[in-house]
Structures are given as structure tokens and as C-alpha cells.
């Protein structure tokens, strides 16, 4: 086997694995989109189709009759059932109603329906009216944007310090900072909640916002990795031109860190948009401050039997993060690769 043939086989295998992996990750989203366009009955049916569709009907004597595929004399015909019976049923040929009624012996429940594509776009309109989306979107955007600003501001300064300055115990401090990534949040949950409770912050936005203005280890790591790739000669040139540390950060470092900053910002924005536990813990009893994650949970509990509406409002909630990712995808991928996440 030649080297070229081996490489071709490897590429084919890689392509197949990639397609399978992408399909695996997209499957829940595709199911959600499909379910949001179905009726309640279609979702609860054991024989539901992957796509939204409903049985075809034919109007006969002012009544809508379902179409079935009926075997007659060894030939399958599409007929409309006008009278259902236990052992025999009466059908009519929709292409030739004047030919009269057709009596078919057998159990009609064993027959297959004739289906047609029938998406229920009204689910989105009904779901939108059933929940205060504008309030939920406003609260979620406020929470996501202000915490994204806070984490970018603090993480940038900390990463700049670790990547550009030498100080005592620098390595040990960085190791301690990174070690907090593996620290389970449950370990600090009770002490942190107690502190916020005694400060009188429970029931306000402060416990959700203030901590993000004190850096994040994961974001610091990503930004530091990116900054380490910027030549130090540029810092020296800026210093010769009279720039201090802050001016160097603003004029030299930040313009070159745009991809990494966008990546970190998107990571945090998506996390804040989907954050459920923290708002549930600190905003309990204040529905006017609920973000969309809590709103969807409450909606799901209220409309637990209306699965199609739950999936419709869930798809609506995904629109904003999806659009943001599409717009910033180029910078996001560049920042992820250069900062070392890909590796």
C-alpha cells in the first residue's frame, strides 16, 4: 500500500468521524427544532416521524376523513375512511368519490396513514405569548453583558501582570490561581452564600455580578497564553516612546489580543446566558429579576404537558447566542487556536 493511498484512507476515516461527531452534537438541536414544529399529539405518538407531519385528510360530505394506505386485491390504494369498524370499515376513493363506498374487511388500526409535511409555526407565536420573553431577555442580557465586561476587565489586567511582569512568588501564585479551576463549586457554596446573606445581597443582582469583577482563573489562563505570544520587543519600543505599563497595555497589547478577548467574552457570555443555578439560588422569590434560564424552567413546570410549546420557547431562547456566535465566529476560532485551547 502506497503512502498516498494510506493518506487518502486516513482522510476518509477522519471525514467520517468528523461528520458522525457533528451529527451527534447537532441531534438534540435538530430534535428540538422538529419537536417545536409538531402538535402535542404528534409528539406523544409512539410512531412519530422525525419531521413534523400530520395525516392527510379528504373532505367528504362536509367531514374530514383521514387517508390510509389500504391493500385491496393485492394492490395498495390511498383511500379515505368514512366509517370505522372493528372488523370491517368503509372507505371512499378520493380520486373518484362517485364510484361509491368501498367496504374493507380488517382492522383499520393496522393500516398506515398517508402523511403530509405540516409544520406548526403557530407554536412559536403561542409560546411567545405564554411567557414574558421581553422581561426575561432584558434580565438575561443585563446579567450576561455586565458580567462579561467585569470578567474581561479583571482577567485582562491579571493576565497582563502574569505575562509581562516579574515579581516574587509569581509562579506559585499562578499555580494557586489555576488550581482553583478544579475546585468544585459545592465546596465554597455555603460559605459564599453566608457571606452574601450577611451583606444583605441575597435577592439582588450583586452576588451574581460582583464576583466577576475579581477575575476568573480559566479566562486568565487563556489571555495569558495569548499575551505570551506577543514579542516583548514591542513593550520595550513602547517604553522608549514614553508609554507606561497601562499605556502599553492599552496601545500595544490589547489591539493584538482582540481574538482572545472575543473568545473569552463569548465563553463567558454563553455561560452567563445559560446560568441556572446561581440565579435560582440568589434570586429566588423575585420573578421580576429572573433570567431566561429560570423563566424556561418555570414555564416547563407550568406547561409540562405542552411539550411542543416548551420546545418552541427553548428554541427562541437559543436565537440570541446563535446569532452572536455566527457573527463572531472568525475571531472566536482564531482566539481559541492561538490561546492554546485547541492544543
Describe the role of every protein-language-model region:
Residues 2-343:
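A structural signal for multi-pass alpha-helical bundles of membrane permease subunits
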Amino acid at each position: 500500500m502506497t503512502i498516498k493511498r494510506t493518506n487518502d484512507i486516513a482522510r476518509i476515516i477522519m471525514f467520517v468521524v468528523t461528520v458522525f461527531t457533528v451529527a451527534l452534537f447537532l441531534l438534540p438541536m435538530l430534535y428540538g427544532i422538529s419537536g417545536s414544529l409538531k402538535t402535542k399529539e404528534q409528539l406523544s405518538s409512539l410512531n412519530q416521524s422525525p419531521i413534523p407531519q400530520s395525516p392527510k385528510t379528504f373532505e367528504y360530505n362536509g367531514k374530514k376523513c383521514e387517508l390510509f394506505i389500504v391493500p385491496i386485491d393485492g394492490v395498495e390504494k390511498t383511500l379515505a375512511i368514512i366509517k370505522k369498524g372493528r372488523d370491517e370499515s368503509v372507505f371512499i376513493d378520493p380520486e373518484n368519490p362517485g364510484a361509491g363506498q368501498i367496504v374493507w374487511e380488517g382492522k383499520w388500526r393496522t393500516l398506515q396513514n398517508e402523511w403530509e409535511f405540516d409544520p406548526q409555526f403557530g407554536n412559536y407565536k403561542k409560546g411567545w405569548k405564554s411567557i414574558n420573553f421581553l422581561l426575561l431577555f432584558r434580565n438575561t442580557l443585563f446579567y450576561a453583558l455586565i458580567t462579561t465586561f467585569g470578567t474581561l476587565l479583571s482577567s485582562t489586567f491579571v493576565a497582563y501582570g502574569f505575562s509581562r511582569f516579574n515579581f516574587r512568588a509569581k509562579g506559585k501564585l499562578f499555580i494557586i490561581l489555576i488550581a482553583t479551576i478544579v475546585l468544585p463549586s459545592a465546596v465554597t457554596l455555603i460559605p459564599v452564600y453566608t457571606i452574601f446573606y450577611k451583606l444583605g445581597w441575597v435577592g439582588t443582582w450583586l452576588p451574581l455580578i460582583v464576583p466577576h469583577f475579581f477575575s476568573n482563573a480559566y479566562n486568565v489562563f487563556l489571555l495569558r497564553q495569548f499575551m505570551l505570544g506577543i514579542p516583548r520587543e514591542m513593550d520595550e519600543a513602547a517604553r522608549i516612546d514614553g508609554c507606561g505599563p497601562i499605556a502599553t497595555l492599552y496601545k500595544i497589547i490589547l489591539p493584538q489580543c482582540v481574538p482572545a478577548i472575543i473568545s473569552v467574552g463569548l465563553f463567558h457570555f454563553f455561560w452567563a446566558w445559560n446560568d441556572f443555578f446561581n440565579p435560582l439560588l440568589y434570586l429566588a422569590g423575585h420573578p421580576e429579576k429572573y433570567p431566561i434560564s429560570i423563566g424556561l424552567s418555570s414555564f416547563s413546570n407550568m406547561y409540562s404537558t405542552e411539550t411542543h410549546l416548551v420546545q418552541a420557547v427553548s428554541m427562541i431562547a437559543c436565537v440570541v447566542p446563535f446569532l452572536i456566535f455566527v457573527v463572531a465566529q472568525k475571531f472566536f476560532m482564531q482566539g481559541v487556536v492561538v490561546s492554546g485551547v485547541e492544543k
